[in-house]
Amino acid sequence: MRKIIIHVIILFISTFSYGQRLENLIKIGLENNPEIQKFETAYKGVLEKKNEVDAIPNTQFGFGYFASEPETRTGAQRFKLSVKQMIPWFGSITARQNYISSMAEAKFENIAIAKRRLIASLSQTYYNLFTIKEKQEILKKNIALLKTYEKMALTSVETGKASAVDVLKLQIRENDLEQLIEVLGHQFLSMQTKMNTLLSRKKDFKIEVLDSLVISSSFDTIGADNLSLHPELLKYDKLYKSVEQSELLNQKEQKPMIGFGLDYVAVSERPNMSFSDNGKDIVMPMVSLSIPIFSKKHSSKTKQNKLKQEELLFDKQIRQNKLTSMLDTAINERIAAKISFDTHMKNLEKADSAEQILLKSYESGSINFNDVLDIQELKLKFQMKQIEAIKSFYIQSTIINYLSN
């Protein structure tokens, strides 16, 4: 087993160290991940809507030609030109902008959530790769140790202190461990493919992992209060705010729209007549109001907004309960991983002592190779469980980091 560093440090979850190689992988993943890019594009699309809602209604132009020219005192009317512009009630455009801004803020939280999830997935995959590689190294060292025992057994066979069966048992054990190394090799390739998929690159791109990981013996106290600023919950707050802005916009849309216009009528001169207004064109400024008399649509919208807010509060509570449960589980699982690591470290020390006793027996002229195999198997079991404890410790720390920062 490679050197496992046991160092008393305080693991600040807000500055959890992933190791330089993992940090580089995370940087690559954040730059290339299509899901993050999708949410960023959606966010930009909502922001662009602000330019759309800034616009006022289209200006109306009209032209009319009198097929039968009506006679007036000043002459016959020939054609009519008109222009009209409706303007929303005061504050309506601002209300639309505020609504779009609130929607954009909610969309932005999707980016933060996607980034957190990607970091967590990359980290967990990385620690799985570390575990597989570390197990392979442990098995290789155990095989080397078994080969040493095999040589000892062959020497004992020559002196009549061991049988050929002992040698065969050791060789069978070596074959079993070599088979496990091969299986782990395929598992590593599978996990490497998963990592490269998360990084949006070719599946056979080689991943390098750390040779050792630091395991902490003390941790910060983490509670449910740490969840308050989690983007999965902030998203509900911002969606709630967007519904509030939607209702303010709904109230503005119940107000009348003001219209300003101008009519121009071309008038022909009356023949054989002379007076000051003969043929004088008509110019008529106009003001109009568009009033939503039937407001059932807006009343329904108000009720819908209220129900939507209630739904969001329930959704937030459900998600908060789930995240709280996840955090509590991760905290306790991490503590359990540390306990398991310490226990297996003690067991390894005992197994090493037993192994030394057996080796001294060999020096004195006798050794029980069945006991050797038993001790070797025990040591391998403790080493494997210790690696699993390290993996669990870091994976649970990743979950805590995802939830509490």
Residue ranges with predicted function:
Residues K3, R117-P231, A330-E333, A337, ...:
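Periplasmic alpha-helical coiled-coil/stalk elements that build and connect Gram-negative outer-membrane
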Residues K38-K50, A114, L118-E137, T148, ...:
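Amphipathic alpha-helical coiled-coil segments
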